[in-house]
Amino acid sequence: MKEKLTHFKVGQIVNTQGLKGEVRVYPLTDDIERFDELKDFYLGKDLNNKLAVEKVRYKGSMVIMKIKGIDSIEKAEKLKNKFMYVSREDSRELEEGEFFIADMIGMEVLTVDGKYVGILEDVLQYSANDVYVVKGEEDKEFMIPAIKKFVPTIDIDERKMIIDPIKGMID
């Protein structure tokens, strides 16, 4: 059984902003406002390198962040292209029926009749609804809309997704 991730990637520092050490962050989360609540984060996968957030603001789809101890453009330059991680405990609380994509990837997908369809490989996020990308046998790829009508059951603990496909969806 796949172990749950302990940390999630929430953004990538892509550039500096100004001369006083602010950085531009490309958010890797579907909830950009989660940065308002961010008190600290890990830089890269080094869980000993925890940095504190001083201030957050937004410019278009980017997050502009001031990090405690980063007070010059030279220090900020050293953070470019690094990924930001938060611990599972510090991630946002999920509503009933919501799951972290990282916990879903790799789960087995079956029909309501018990027929094996494949493995969940990706989740595409669209404004209307998400779409599950399932890799079947012989590298066939199926796109399943993430709505209750087609996906009546997701069992994170058992790592199974049950789908109720219409004709042509998985043929």
From Swiss-Prot:
Residues 96-169 form the PRC barrel domain. InterPro entries: PRC_barrel-like_sf, PRC_RimM, RimM, RimM_N, RimM_N_sf, Transl_B-barrel_sf. Keywords: Chaperone, Cytoplasm, Ribosome biogenesis, rRNA processing. Its main location: cytoplasm. One of its GO terms (molecular function) is ribosome binding. One of its GO terms (cellular component) is cytoplasm. It comes from the Bacteria. It is found in: Cytoplasm. Pfam families: PRC_RimM, RimM. SUPFAM superfamilies: PRC-barrel domain (SSF50346), Translation proteins (SSF50447). Signal peptide: none annotated. GO terms for biological process: ribosomal small subunit biogenesis; rRNA processing. An accessory protein needed during the final step in the assembly of 30S ribosomal subunit, possibly for assembly of the head region. Essential for efficient processing of 16S rRNA. May be needed both before and after RbfA during the maturation of 16S rRNA. It has affinity for free ribosomal 30S subunits but not for 70S ribosomes. Binds ribosomal protein uS19. Belongs to the RimM family. This is Ribosome maturation factor RimM. The gene is rimM.
